[in-house]
């Protein structure tokens, strides 16, 4: 089992590394050239900027039983199809039961943008979100260890 982080814009890279270290689980950080994130205790793979270049690199590496951290619903869906456990930076675990509704919500938001309406942005990150993320990741790791 490996934890793969879609690190472009990911606020929980360091928290993930801290938890992974406690469980002895290797971490791979994947990012593009505008977000190079070298961290001790993790392998960092850097890819050219481009539409979904990091996403496709991550999908090509993920294996059944791996854990993926991403906020990208499309990437999450592809990783679920490869039997990975997938969670976002707020501790929401993506599953076969919720991914379709999340993808539909993303589609509806993009439709609104095309009409000139802008959905409300995300509020500032809170400590509670970090706690939820840590709890979810630890539960997954405890289950798989």
Residue positions per predicted region:
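Nuclease catalytic cores that cleave nucleic-acid phosphodiester bonds
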Residues: 2-145
